[in-house]
Each structure stands twice: as C-alpha cells, then as structure tokens.
Amino acid sequence: EQNDIDAVLTGHDHAYSRSKMLLGGTKANDYTDDEFDAELEKDMDAGENPTTKTVAPGNIKNDSTDEKDQKYLAYLKSIMDEKAIETVKKQGSSVINPEGVLYMTAGSSSGSKYYDLVPRQQTYIAHRWQEDVPTYSVVDVTENSLTINTYRTDNDEKIDETFSITKSKG
C-alpha cells in the first residue's frame, strides 16, 4: 500500500488463491509455529475432495471443547481481519480505482506436489482452487489496467473468473 502497488503475484504454493482487495490489515503474531502446525494437521484432514465448511469467520464456532482447538480457532478468527477487505466499485469483473492490494498465489505449475485446501476458507480469499492439476496465469497489462486469467494445463479451462483492476488515468 505504501508503495502504491496494485497486485502481488506470488508462487511456490501448492494451491491457487486470489484475495479480495485488501487495505490496511493488521498482523497477528501470538501463535507459535508448532502450535499452529499441530492444529492445522487436524483441519487439513479433509479427504480427497474437501469442501469448504463455510467461509470464515462464520465457520469458527465452538467446534470442540479442547483448549488447544479453542486457541487455534481464536487465532484463526484474529487473522480473518474483515476490516482489511476493501469495499470496491466494480464494473463487470473489474474493480475500479481500488486503493488496496490484490494478492494472487499461483498453484503448482510443475504438478510435482499439491496440498489439499483447508476446509475453513479465509475471509480475505475471493477464490481458491485445487484439483491436483497444474495451472498457469495469463496477465495482461495496459496503461491503466491489469487483467488476470488462470487456467488448468490439462484442458485449458479457466479455474477462476477473469479479474481486472482498472485505474483512471492521471
């Protein structure tokens, strides 16, 4: 945000995700990696075709009376940061003059490794995808727009809607 960046395109994850436009979020650092990993293993055990329970934080309920589970749920709720989701003006699949940043993580391009989607979809994620197929994205940049389309490599079908950021000139 401070550097007037509109989109952050990243890789090296084993599932695709595209965020909503995010603006002014805060970072929570009160959970150790070991604690998180232990609880995440339970959450990740979603089987071959995991389905999203509900979009978080609505799904963060008292799933368990276990103290460790409750701490994990409290941590998840703390990082959902609904206030960081920018309300944007849209025109079709394009957001118009957003102030925030889009974060997109490409899925596996090599097909060598995949991760199952966790059943608790994060509040800040607009779309995610994982069907154990490599993907690729086509990014078109013009003077005032950025457009992203992402496809499966096995049949070239889109895995997400076209997403564009359009900025007024000037």
Predicted segments with their positions:
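Short, solvent-exposed aromatic-acidic interface loops
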Residues: N149-I159
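Long, structured stretches of catalytic cores involved in phosphate-ester chemistry, encompassing
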Residues: E1-T147
